């Protein structure tokens, strides 16, 4: 079953995490707002205008308490909880880092894939460095992210997941400072 745009918009929510992302966050939010109104931005004590920029775009914002250690897993879990309180009917959640742009065709492709493969819990695409030529580090990131296409044992931080399965496994392990996505997929 292929979802029509209106069905898709009511079925999916986004959790975006970040800290001091600046214009990268603006680009991220602009790339996803056309797909769904259900967007939560989780901010980890930004000192720039990230929170203001998200609010200006009509995005729900959750500012994490600085008394507890920041981790991507903690931020994603908190954002997911807020998202479901606001939009309890969602079938899919897309997690994204605030410095990432979601490709125009990705969301519909991801939902279509999950609809056609009910045994699959999560799908992710090819993450690309926006400016691989800018530095050796950027180039190495782009090379590292060039993972094989097809069935995988794990996903990265930018992925579409079934809400029911994410709830069933009780989210990411918030105690991990990194690698929470592969651990979730075990």
Task: List where the protein language model places each region.
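Acidic helix N-cap motif at the loop->helix transition within catalytic regions
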Residues: 24-27, 48-57, 63
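Short, well-formed alpha-helical segments that are part of the catalytic scaffolds
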Residues: 19-35
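A short, conserved alpha-helix in the catalytic core of glycosyltransferases
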Residues: 165-170, 175-186
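Glycine-rich, basic loop-to-helix element that forms the pyrophosphate-binding segment
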Residues: 66-85
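Short beta-strand-to-loop acidic/aromatic patch adjacent to the donor-nucleotide binding site
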Residues: 87-101
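A recurrent flexible, glycine/aromatic-enriched loop bordering the glycosyltransferase active site
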Residues: 129-130, 144-161, 177, 183
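Conserved donor NDP-sugar-binding/catalytic core segment of glycosyltransferases
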Residues: 101-136
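A conserved acidic beta->alpha catalytic loop
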Residues: 31, 43-52, 66, 100
């Amino acid at each position: 079953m292929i979802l029509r745009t209106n069905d898709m918009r009511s079925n999916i929510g986004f959790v975006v995490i970040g800290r001091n992302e600046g214009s990268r966050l603006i680009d991220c939010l602009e790339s996803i707002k056309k797909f769904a109104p259900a967007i939560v931005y989780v901010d980890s004590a930004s000192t720039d205008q990230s929170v203001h920029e998200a609010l200006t775009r009509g995005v729900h914002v959750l500012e994490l308490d600085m008394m507890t250690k920041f981790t991507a897993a903690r931020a994603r879990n908190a954002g997911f909880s807020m998202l479901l309180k606001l939009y309890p009917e969602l079938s899919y959640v897309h997690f994204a880092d605030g410095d990432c742009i979601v490709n125009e065709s990705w969301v519909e492709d991801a939902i279509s894939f999950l609809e056609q493969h009910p045994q699959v819990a999560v799908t992710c695409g090819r993450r690309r460095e926006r400016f691989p030529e800018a530095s050796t580090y950027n180039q190495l990131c782009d090379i590292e992210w060039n993972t094989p296409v097809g069935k995988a044992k794990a996903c990265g931080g930018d992925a579409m997941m079934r809400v029911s399965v994410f709830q069933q496994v009780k989210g990411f392990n918030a105690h991990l400072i990194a690698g929470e996505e592969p651990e979730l997929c075990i």
